[in-house]
A protein has these predicted regions:
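Glycine-rich, charged/polar anion/phosphate-binding loops
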Residues: 303-305, 474-479, 485-490
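Short helix/loop capping segments that flank catalytic or ligand/cofactor-binding pockets
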Residues: 95-98, 262-263, 438, 502-504, ...
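Extracellular/periplasmic, surface-exposed regions of secreted and cell-surface proteins
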Residues: 1-102, 110-423, 427, 568-634
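Extracytoplasmic gating/loop element in the C-terminal half of outer-membrane beta-barrel translocons
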Residues: 51, 115, 451, 455, ...
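Conserved small-residue
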Residues: 267, 382-482, 522, 533, ...
Length: 634
């Protein structure tokens, strides 16, 4: 398979100027290699030829997985009816072996004196850059393995006596994952007790008593209980007059605790939180001798043990409603509120003067709220003998915020994360583009960005009023970020005689994206010289196009010349809501066969027009596909 990133290949292809050099030059008699085209980006640096990048290496990977499970089940009715013992043991061994083969491409260009404008079809080429290789080289074989051992033993009890139903479960679990020698271990107990009376009154209690090796003794195990209850209102006698309209109505709610022992890992916390980590020869030491000619490295504490570390915890509350109307319409509505606390994070409020060089302490102090509502709907009805119509829909709204986050002592409240959404848009408030030098001279100082401010650059609002544009002037531009708060979908299915039609739409709302880090701003990421997007080339600020509302500020030769324009600001924030015509299918049924035509990703509607609003500008685009097929039934 390919030995490269598909996204990188797409970016190189997307950003390489197609007229700078050809992908290849014609082969000559006796050639033992492909003549890839290229050119000098600088005195010694070549461009990236996407075809050469794709063709220069590949890899072969072999995976082996051994998965063995054994379970035993024993009914214990001789003790009490409905009691059962189950034991499960699972062992999985996974291994990977990988090697790659590669060659160094040969690059060529048209020589400076090797062509004539009068006869452009005739030219001479010359080799550039380091010599390539005519033969493929092979890497060493790389092997990786891991093993997982899992054990659980459980007692189940289920029994119905008259109008009472009772079930219970008690389980012990142990898991060990071993990779790179050091194992990961978890163990714990869990249980569940469920009761219902007349299928109308429902109650459940469950718990987990879980342990992790990441924490110190005394804190490794924690108890996580949860309770839930439900009431089938439509089962009551007083509801009978309503059964013709609402034949099922259930109210349900739950509250409980859930724990996670992976807290802090994504942010860089140590695996064993209760241990100090010390590095030798890490750049800290002392010198001695009359002339300071002797130096010795000393130990450096790179991670401090987390005192009294605990499990991260989520307090989850849900309340829901399930309704069925006219035996046709099913509606489920659920509200949820999660309070996540004990989030492990570094103490940003501790100043460096306290002596924490590489070992800023961690603490279980973060708190985050997440709440929202979920709605799902299904409806189906046979309108007349030959025609049936069905509809489905779903809607989700979620919002979150930092309840508490340890932060530095900021001078202004708008710099704080606490009390604000996690996924918000932050940046400078843009006030348009500078029209001339006189306006620049009268504007608050913008030298902190490092480039010479010129007409056509973006001007920013001085929020703190100190006469300078600095990071203290960055504010929350929108509570909505690139993760939508609202996601929804709806569809229809129709059957008429032997024809059937189905379609589905999905979309998102309350979503913004920031497009400041796009070409040509990110030129250094790939080739250093890239194409301009059409919308930029058609409407950027210039002396010949001094529009105060141009869609793009002035251009520069290098990124450093326009660094003030690349920062996040309201100038670059865009509404990325969208509605997508996701799928469509038309079918016709014969006695033993159904033929169909379907399509995927048929259309998208959005106020954002530059590219697919669900993707980023350099992402591989979603394909629009059509299929014709047949399904046979015998």
């Amino acid at each position: 398979g390919p030995n490269y990133s598909i996204s990188d290949l797409f970016n190189y292809t997307y950003n390489t100027n197609p007229i700078t050099f050809p992908a290849t030059f014609p082969a000559l008699e006796g050639d033992t290699h492909i003549r890839f085209g290229n050119a000098y980006l600088s005195s010694s640096r070549l461009y990236t030829n996407p075809l050469a990048y794709m063709s220069s290496s590949f890899r072969e990977t072999n995976y082996n997985t051994l998965n063995v499970s054994m379970s035993l089940e024993q009914k214990l009715d001789f003790i009490t009816e409905g009691l059962k013992l189950t034991a499960l043991v699972n062992f999985k061994n996974w291994s990977e072996s990988l090697y790659s083969r590669s060659m160094t491409p040969w690059y060529y260009r048209v020589s400076d004196d090797g062509w004539s404008a009068n006869a452009p079809e005739k030219f001479f080429i010359e080799q550039i850059g380091p010599n390539g290789s005519d033969y493929i080289s092979q890497s060493d074989l790389t092997r990786s393995t891991d093993q997982t051992f899992y054990l659980d033993t459980r007692l189940d009890y289920s029994r119905t006596i008259d109008e009472h139903s009772l079930s219970a479960m008690l389980m012990y679990m142990q898991r060990e994952f071993r990779s790179n020698i050091l194992p990961n271990r978890n163990q714990g107990f869990s249980g569940r007790l469920t009761y219902d009376y007349l299928n109308k009154y429902l109650a459940e209690f469950n718990f987990g008593y879980n342990g992790t090796e990441r924490l110190a003794k005394g804190n490794r195990f924690e108890f996580f209980p949860a309770v839930s209850a439900g009431w089938v209102v439509s089962g009551e006698d007083f509801w009978e007059p309503m059964n013709d309209y609402i034949d099922f109505l259930k109210i349900r709610s739950s509250y409980g605790l859930v724990g996670s022992d992976e807290t802090g890992l994504a942010a860089g916390a140590a695996h064993f939180l209760y241990q100090n980590e010390v590095a030798m020869n890490s750049g800290y030491g002392f010198t001695t001798g009359a002339a300071g000619e002797y130096g010795l490295w000393g130990p450096n504490v790179t991670r401090l043990a987390v005192e009294d570390a605990h499990w991260e915890r989520v307090k989850k509350f849900n309340v829901g409603l399930d309704i069925r109307m006219f035996e046709q319409l099913n509606l489920a509505v659920e509200f949820f509120h999660d309070r996540r606390d004990r989030i492990l994070m570094q103490r940003a409020s501790f100043p460096a003067i306290m002596g924490y060089v590489d070992s800023t302490p961690w603490s279980n102090i973060g708190k985050v709220d997440n709440k929202g509502i979920e709605v799902s709907l299904n409806w189906s009805k046979q309108l007349f003998n030959d025609f049936t119509l069905a509809a489905t829909g779903n809607f989700t709204y979620t919002a979150n915020k930092f309840v508490y986050k340890d932060e530095p002592d900021y001078p202004y409240s708008w710099q704080m994360d606490t009390g604000k959404p996690l996924n918000r848009m932050t940046g400078y408030i843009a006030e348009g583009l500078f029209k001339d030098q006189a306006e620049i001279d009268a504007w608050p100082d913008m030298s902190s960005f490092g480039n010479a401010i010129m007409p056509g650059d973006i001007k920013y609002r001085d929020i703190d009023g100190d006469g300078r544009i600095t990071q203290e002037d960055m504010v929350m531009l929108s509570p909505y970020g690139n993760i939508p708060r609202i996601q929804y979908g709806f569809g229809l299915n129709m059957v008429y005689k032997k024809f059937d039609v189905g379609l589905f739409f999905n979309g998102s709302a309350q979503r913004n994206i920031m497009i400041n880090n796009i070409v040509p701003f990110n030129a250094d990421d790939f080739n250093g010289e890239q194409n301009l997007m059409k919308w930029i080339a058609e409407d950027y600020w210039s002396t010949s196009n001094p529009k105060p509302n141009a869609v793009f500020p002035r251009l520069g030769i290098t990124q450093a010349q326009t660094s003030s324009n690349t920062v996040g600001s309201s100038f670059w924030m865009r509404n990325a809501n969208f509605l997508r015509f996701k799928t469509f299918e038309l079918g016709y049924r014969f006695p033993y066969c159904r033929i169909y035509l379907n399509g995927d990703n048929l259309a998208v509607w959005s106020p954002f027009k530059l590219w697919d609003p669900e993707l980023w500008h350099n992402s591989y685009p979603l394909s629009r596909t059509f299929n014709i097929g047949a399904q046979f039934t015998f």
